Amino acid sequence: MAVKFSILVVCLNPGAKLAETVESIRKQEYRDYEIIVKDGGSKDGSTELLPADEKIRLIEKKDTGIYDAMNQAVSEAAGEYVLFLNCGDLFYDEQVLTRTAKAMEKNPGKGIYYGDTYCSKTDSLQTAPGRMTPFQCFRNIPCHQSCFYARRLFADRQYLPEYRIRADYEHFLWCVLKQKEEAVSLPFTVAA
C-alpha cells in the first residue's frame, strides 16, 4: 500500500528511546504514514515493547553499521517520501507531518524538503538555511532527522556504508550538487 511518508527508525539496543521515538510518530495528526523499525539484533527487549499498530513494521536483520541499517530500512519503504527519525530523535510537535504535507502540496515534486532541528541537550535551534546554495551545502546542511527525501533518491544510490560517519551529509551533497535535486526549506522545526 502506497503512503505519503515512510518514517524510518533504526536501532540496536535502544532501551526506552525506541518507544519514545515511535510514540512521537504515532502522535502525528496526519495519518498517511508508515513506521519502519529496523533493528540490528537488539538484546535489551526494546522491540518487544513496540505497540500493536498496523502502521508499524519491524524488520529484524543484522547490519554492518548505522548506514547499512538505514539503507536496509529505506529498501523496505513504501512511502513517496522518507524521513530517518532514529532512536532518540522525536518530531518537534504533533503537526509536523500535516505542515509538511501542506508545504509539499504548494511546492510539489521536489527531491528534498527540510526544516530546522531543536537540540534539547543544548536548548538550541539548529536553523537550516532558507535557500540551499552550493556554499550552504558545504557550510550548513540540515540534520538528517529534519530532511524528507523523495524515496526515488535512494533507488539507484543509497548511503555509502564505507563512511562510518557523515554518509548522510555526503548523500545530501550528492542529491543537491550532483543530481541537481531541488531542496526546499520548510519554515518550521521538524525534529527534536
Report the location of each language-model feature.
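Nucleotide-sugar donor-binding/catalytic module of glycosyltransferases
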Residues: 1-192
